[in-house]
Amino acid sequence: MAKKSKIAKEQKREKLVAQYYELRKELKDKGDYEALRKLPRDSSPTRLTRRCKVTGRPRGVYRKFGMSRIALRDYAHKGQIPGVKKSSW
């Protein structure tokens, strides 16, 4: 489990990215890089990190499920993810 402060920080970044999305897009289209530079750093989508929705783990996260490989395996074995089952061949 990730630290709660790290998870909260990432959520704060997500809010900032959503808040400044339109403004950033307009400034980029105009080519006003000076104004872009004055915006908060955390409003840039590049600074976002995908984190597991269950554990907050930053590494090994599947985009399709939004979960880390470890949490995905646990949930899949319990049958809590529809359409996912253990394969064998």
From Swiss-Prot:
InterPro entries per the UniProt record, alphabetical: Ribosomal_uS14, Ribosomal_uS14_bac/plastid, Ribosomal_uS14_CS, Ribosomal_uS14_sf
A GO biological process held by the record: translation
Keywords from the named record: Ribonucleoprotein, Ribosomal protein, RNA-binding, rRNA-binding
GO molecular function annotation: rRNA binding; structural constituent of ribosome
Entry GO CC: cytoplasm; small ribosomal subunit
Pfam assignment, any one: Ribosomal_S14
UniProt superkingdom: Bacteria
NCBIfam families: PRK08881.1
Family to which this protein belongs: Belongs to the universal ribosomal protein uS14 family.
Subunit structure, as described in the record: Part of the 30S ribosomal subunit. Contacts proteins S3 and S10.
Name of the protein in question: Small ribosomal subunit protein uS14A
